[in-house]
């Protein structure tokens, strides 16, 4: 069993509010627009970090963090990217990766809008954690926590 914190669009922000929300997770997964390699290092020193780069991330961050990251957690196949779209409207690169890798959990950021939806076409859970940072049009900063226990994804908040 692992407790996962999912964030995106921090744009250079990782403050006490986020630390408090994420203090009990086992890992943090960041869906891009980190803000800097230094901020990624700060997050990684707080909790183990898996991350992808986003459209505002510079060259150094892009060299360390890929556009797409595929991995398994507790037997659940995960695919994460920054700009992925939504069910029935995935961007072409994300759709190709989903079709090739068959993830059960697809995570994307970019929109700054928190949205969790089941995709019946690809039989996956799509999670966009919204924006955890202070910059952008969003009015409320958001992040997601969930438990992955075998094939069971639960206790999402």
Segments predicted by a language model, with ranges:
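Active-site environment of divalent metal-dependent phosphoester hydrolases
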Residues: 12-16, 34-39, 56-61, 85-90, ...
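Active-site neighborhood of phospho(di)ester-bond hydrolases with catalytic His/Asp-centered motifs
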Residues: 6-8, 27-33, 50-55, 79-82, ...
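Short beta-strand scaffold segments in enzyme catalytic cores
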Residues: 69-70, 115-118, 142-146
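N-terminal active-site segment of His-dependent metallophosphoesterases
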Residues: 1-49, 57-75, 139-142
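Active-site-proximal segments of metal-dependent phosphoesterases and phosphodiesterases across multiple
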Residues: 57-102, 134-135
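Binuclear metal-dependent phosphoesterase catalytic core
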Residues: 2, 73-74, 101-102, 127-157
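Short, conserved loop/helix-junction motifs that constitute active-site signature segments
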Residues: 43-45, 98-101, 121
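Solvent-exposed alpha-helices and their adjacent loops that cap or buttress functional pockets
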Residues: 21, 72, 98, 117-119, ...
């Amino acid at each position: 069993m692992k407790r996962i914190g999912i964030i995106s669009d921090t744009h250079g922000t990782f403050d006490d509010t986020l630390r408090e929300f994420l203090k009990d997770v086992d890992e943090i997964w960041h869906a891009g627009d980190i803000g800097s390699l230094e901020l990624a290092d700060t997050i990684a020193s707080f909790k183990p970090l898996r991350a992808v780069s986003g459209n505002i991330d510079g060259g150094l961050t892009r060299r360390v963090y890929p556009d797409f990251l595929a991995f398994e957690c507790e037997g659940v196949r995960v695919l994460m990217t920054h700009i992925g779209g939504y069910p029935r409207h995935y961007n072409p690169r994300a759709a190709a990766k989903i079709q090739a890798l068959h993830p059960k959990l697809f995570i994307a950021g970019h929109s700054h809008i928190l949205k969790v939806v089941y995709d019946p076409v690809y039989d996956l859970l799509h999670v966009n954690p919204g924006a955890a940072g202070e910059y952008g049009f969003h009015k409320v900063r958001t992040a997601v926590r969930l438990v992955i226990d075998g094939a069971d994804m639960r206790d999402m908040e």
